[in-house]
């Protein structure tokens, strides 16, 4: 079978160049009262950049398929998200420094609110990270083993945490123990093969034990567990693209994804301004920078239009600082769309901007979904973004005579 990434890798040259991939998570949207958040936001810097850039839109997986953040990012990094299907658990686990061995299955978990019949809130009101950490500590003290499987809990950000299952004969082909929507009955884990049936049984028993431990907490009284995974084997980004790559991200899952493909994790603060400060400080240390902004996605999922607008404006304000570093290529896009009216990821194409000195500038006047839809790049697969970035950086040889 044709491997596009392997094909591109053979054309990559040793030339030096600086590439920045700025991912605004869940960026794409649909109009509310005639405008998307990108259209409603005051973005003079992004709009000026658009006038000097090639614009287009990406399909992360296939037309009509709604991607998770994992497939969306893998695709942007140049990997086939269908060939490399990775559970979210391993990404979250690696992002917070969890060691994952051969006997381990890891999963991502959310604290939730449950009334005994339906899941009322899949994120338990988004508790503060410190509050969640205390609950994780309580669970660690109360639940250590189920059958012959050791259970280890690790706190994450806000409502998120990681569970590691360690034991013999565990599989990771397990359906999510999560109804995915609020107001729905619980969807319990199911194993799709014999080893995974054991994992599913342990998972469902664990959730019941968690509910028992937390029964007196009106808000944080349940858990949803999903993204079961063992440690996968992927081609490493630095070897494929011949670049030293650094990742600047505040959320564990995205650090985990970057680590999984071989990027170095650069420590940073919690704000967009912190991330750009880190980018400037580490500018001479890497050839490729992946910079991740989470809140565009969070506010899309919460249905908060104005808040999503404000995050876009916050990013717009730091664009001159990135441009002042004079990267050879600046790519601005999202990993998927998260429309405010849907309060969820969607299948809609994702806005894409590529800025370099080699663009066919002059067509576009602003950066938004509709300008991108008519842009010079057209509609492309997200896994082609890295190929384009390398081309705009002068890092690809000619193919053929």
Curated annotation (Swiss-Prot):
What EC class does the entry list?
A: isomerase
Does the record carry Isomerase as a key word? yes
Q: Which EC number(s) does the record attach to this protein?
A: 5.4.2.12
Question: Which pathway is recorded for this entry?
Answer: Carbohydrate degradation; glycolysis; pyruvate from D-glyceraldehyde 3-phosphate: step 3/5
Q: Which UniProt keywords apply?
A: Glycolysis, Isomerase
Q: Which Pfam family, just one, is annotated for this protein?
A: Metalloenzyme
Which InterPro entries does the record associate with it? Alkaline_phosphatase_core_sf (IPR017850), ApgAM_prokaryotes (IPR023665), Metalloenzyme (IPR006124), Pglycerate_mutase_ApgM (IPR004456)
Classify the source by domain of life: Bacteria
GO terms of molecular function: metal ion binding; phosphoglycerate mutase activity
Q: Name one GO biological process term.
A: glycolytic process
Catalysed reaction(s) here are: (2R)-2-phosphoglycerate = (2R)-3-phosphoglycerate
- Isomerase among the record's keywords? yes
Report the function annotation for this chain.
Catalyzes the interconversion of 2-phosphoglycerate and 3-phosphoglycerate.
What family name appears in the similarity comment? Belongs to the BPG-independent phosphoglycerate mutase family. A-PGAM subfamily.
Protein name (database record): Probable 2,3-bisphosphoglycerate-independent phosphoglycerate mutase
**UniProt organism field:** Thermotoga sp. (strain RQ2)
What lineage is this protein's organism placed in?
Bacteria, Thermotogati, Thermotogota, Thermotogae, Thermotogales
């Amino acid at each position: 079978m044709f491997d596009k990434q392997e094909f591109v890798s053979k054309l990559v040259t040793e030339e030096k160049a600086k590439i920045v991939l700025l991912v605004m998570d869940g960026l794409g949207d649909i109009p509310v009262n005639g405008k998307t958040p990108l259209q409603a936001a005051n973005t003079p810097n992004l709009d000026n950049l658009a006038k000097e850039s090639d614009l287009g839109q990406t399909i992360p997986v296939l037309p009509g398929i709604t991607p998770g953040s994992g497939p969306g990012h893998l695709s942007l990094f140049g990997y086939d998200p269908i060939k490399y299907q990775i559970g979210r658990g391993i990404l979250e686990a690696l992002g917070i420094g969890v060691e994952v061995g051969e006997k381990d299955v890891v999963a991502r978990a959310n604290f939730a609110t449950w009334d005994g019949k339906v899941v009322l809130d899949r994120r338990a009101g988004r508790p503060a990270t410190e509050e969640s950490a205390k609950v994780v500590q309580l669970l660690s003290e109360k639940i250590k083993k189920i059958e012959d499987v050791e259970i280890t809990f690790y706190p994450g950000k806000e409502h998120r945490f990681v569970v590691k299952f360690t034991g013999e004969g565990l599989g990771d082909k397990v359906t999510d123990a999560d109804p995915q929507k609020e107001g729905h009955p619980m969807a319990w884990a199911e194993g799709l093969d014999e080893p995974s049936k054991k994992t599913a049984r342990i998972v469902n028993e664990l959730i019941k034990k968690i509910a028992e431990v937390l029964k007196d907490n009106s808000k944080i009284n349940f858990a949803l567990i999903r993204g079961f995974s063992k440690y996968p084997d992927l081609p490493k980004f630095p070897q494929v693209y011949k670049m030293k790559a650094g990742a600047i991200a505040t959320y564990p899952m995205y650090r985990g994804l970057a680590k999984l493909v071989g990027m170095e994790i650069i420590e940073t603060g919690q704000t967009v301004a912190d991330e750009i400060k880190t980018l400037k400080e580490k500018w001479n240390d890497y050839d490729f920078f992946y910079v991740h902004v989470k809140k565009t996605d969070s506010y899309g999922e919460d249905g908060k239009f104005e808040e999503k607008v404000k995050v876009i404006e916050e990013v717009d304000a730091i664009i001159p600082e990135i441009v002042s570093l004079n990267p050879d290529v600046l790519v601005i896009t999202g990993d998927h769309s998260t429309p405010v009216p849907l309060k969820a990821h969607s299948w809609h194409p994702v806005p894409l901007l590529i800025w370099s000195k080699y663009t066919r500038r002059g067509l576009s006047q602003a950066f938004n979904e509709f300008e991108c839809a008519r842009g010079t790049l057209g509609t492309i697969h997200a896994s082609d973004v890295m190929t384009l970035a390398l081309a705009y950086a002068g890092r690809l040889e000619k193919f053929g005579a």
